[in-house]
């Protein structure tokens, strides 16, 4: 497994395959190709009114690619109900290399100077592959996800791959689709010349955020641990 390179990772993602480690200390990586694939439809995200008010209040400030390594470390931290992680040191090194060449990105959410939430993932043409997210304050990861979706829409991305479905994601509009349908969406996305936005702030994305759906009477799932 020592021959895994950033280029090999990108070729794997282009085929719908992604790696995970069995635990934080392992040097081994396994490749995954789920039969049901989680996606967040970029035209069908559900943003409840309470979450929209939080996002639009500007109480939490959002940036991109300011603290990639710190976000990865935070995503790998133990949390209630999750004592182990698939984000090993080797994973962090590989994705750090992808970040330095412009193919992996982070979204950071802060209250004041404190990093309270965020996410990271891989971008490849018109597809963004979400890897992991974290929250240290309630709804911080949801704020990151709303800004991510708004930014991807602005940059003309067509696919947000979440790998699997979770209550947290389905509560915001995430769905699971068959592998064949996913491959079709992926193939289409790889023909698109999307652009990763330079600015993920509320000021830059206000119009795109405001266009997201706000379903009446919908109660979202809570933040993941």
Swiss-Prot record:
Q: Which GO terms describe its cellular component?
A: cytoplasm
Coiled-coil-forming residues are none
- Grouped into one coarse class, the protein's main location is cytoplasm
The record's listing under NCBIfam families reads:
aat
Q: Which reaction does it catalyse?
A: N-terminal L-lysyl-[protein] + L-leucyl-tRNA(Leu) = N-terminal L-leucyl-L-lysyl-[protein] + tRNA(Leu) + H(+); N-terminal L-arginyl-[protein] + L-leucyl-tRNA(Leu) = N-terminal L-leucyl-L-arginyl-[protein] + tRNA(Leu) + H(+); L-phenylalanyl-tRNA(Phe) + an N-terminal L-alpha-aminoacyl-[protein] = an N-terminal L-phenylalanyl-L-alpha-aminoacyl-[protein] + tRNA(Phe)
Q: What is this protein called?
A: Leucyl/phenylalanyl-tRNA--protein transferase
UniProt record similarity statement: Belongs to the L/F-transferase family.
Its BP terms in the Gene Ontology are: protein catabolic process
Assigned keywords, A-Z: Acyltransferase, Cytoplasm, Transferase
Any one Gene Ontology molecular-function term assigned to this protein's record = leucyl-tRNA--protein transferase activity
Which species is this UniProt entry from? Gluconobacter oxydans (strain 621H)
Keyword hit for Transferase: yes
Where in the sequence is the signal peptide annotated?
Answer: none
What function does this protein fulfil? Functions in the N-end rule pathway of protein degradation where it conjugates Leu, Phe and, less efficiently, Met from aminoacyl-tRNAs to the N-termini of proteins containing an N-terminal arginine or lysine.
Please state the Enzyme Commission number of this protein.
2.3.2.6
Q: Which HAMAP family match?
A: Leu_Phe_trans
* Compartments (UniProt record): Cytoplasm
